[in-house]
Amino acid sequence: MFDRLEAVEQRYEKLNELLMDPDVINDPKKLRDYSKEQADLEETVQTYREYKSVREQLAEAKAMLEEKLEPELREMVKEEIGELEEREEALVEKLKVLLLPKDPNDEKNVIMEIRAAAGGEEAALFAGDLYRMYTRYAESQGWKTEVIEASPTGLGGYKEIIFMINGKGAYSKLKFENGAHRVQRVPETESGGRIHTSTATVACLPEMEEIEVEINEKDIRVDTFASSGPGGQSVNTTMSAVRLTHIPTGIVVTCQDEKSQIKNKEKAMKVLRARIYDKYQQEARAEYDQTRKQAVGTGDRSERIRTYNFPQNRVTDHRIGLTIQKLDQVLDGHLDEIIEALILDDQAKKLEQANDAS
């Protein structure tokens, strides 16, 4: 581990030199790439340097114990050694996490797709609740949201809503939201007070740049039509809505949120690119996933990952056994406690895999 950390520190110092090189400064691509690489390494290097400093302080403190000291001073040194040893241990654990392989998509923007599943209109209302929850969370992080496509229902819910979240690190925090979300509550239309169970599915996809997913224009069929509102009525007499069909994969994306056909096509292309990337990624992992499922059970998107229980004001994430009695706050966008727990769980699993492999 420490050989790797030395190599990381050397690379970081080399990047500092490169970023002062006039040839690099005058080359926007190199400047951008080297700056990003340096930023990615910075936390690891600073943590490693703190670790080395603590080690030096620890050695000096232990050396002091070899000298003749007054009893009071000796106790102070022993106390300092205890604190330094605790700090050293914490830094080692942090460095182990920092050296874990990074998800290359973590810093990307996100395309989120929420769809009402079992439960009819109640499921559509819940899809709307989830949409508001994620947009409020995005606001708390300083991220921007933009609706790409929406199919609203008459009571204020959504059969489907697709939206973009623009912000640094958005995918790293929201990628754990993939799956089926379940709600338990008494619908407003329920006169008998019975609790109903409904579900909505969430897909979180990293936004892909054109260079990352090559799409041949001849493989895309473009259809245009007039935009429609709830119930199917036409709300736009111009042919501004766009439907893109990727012929090789059969993936279809529709966008009618903008009044401009060009803007609708641009938005649809972003979603199409992300879905194609996701499909190829799933196919590439299929063989590995099959082996893993046989060993530890399934973990695909169709499984229930979280339950939102209104009568008990409770949220339970079934993957990590986390229960929070703050449903009202969670739906208002306070997702940090859940997301941080999921990130820690993911890191723990990766550390376990790394230890098994070593």
From Swiss-Prot:
One Gene Ontology cellular component: cytoplasm
In-chain residues carrying the UniProt-annotated modification N5-methylglutamine: Q233
Cell compartment(s), UniProt: Cytoplasm
PROSITE patterns in the cross-refs: RF_PROK_I
SMART domains per record: PCRF
Keywords of the record: Cytoplasm, Methylation, Protein biosynthesis
UniProt modification remark: Methylated by PrmC. Methylation increases the termination efficiency of RF1.
Domain of life: Bacteria
Pfam family, one: RF-1
Main location as per UniProt: cytoplasm
Any one Gene Ontology molecular-function term assigned to this protein's record: translation release factor activity, codon specific
InterPro entries: PCRF, Pep_chain_release_fac_I, Pep_chain_release_fac_I_sf, Prokaryotic/Mito_RF, RF-1
HAMAP family (UniProt xref): Rel_fac_1
Family membership noted in the UniProt record: Belongs to the prokaryotic/mitochondrial release factor family.
Biological function: Peptide chain release factor 1 directs the termination of translation in response to the peptide chain termination codons UAG and UAA.
Entry protein name: Peptide chain release factor 1
Organism from which the protein derives: Geobacillus kaustophilus (strain HTA426)
Gene name of the record: prfA
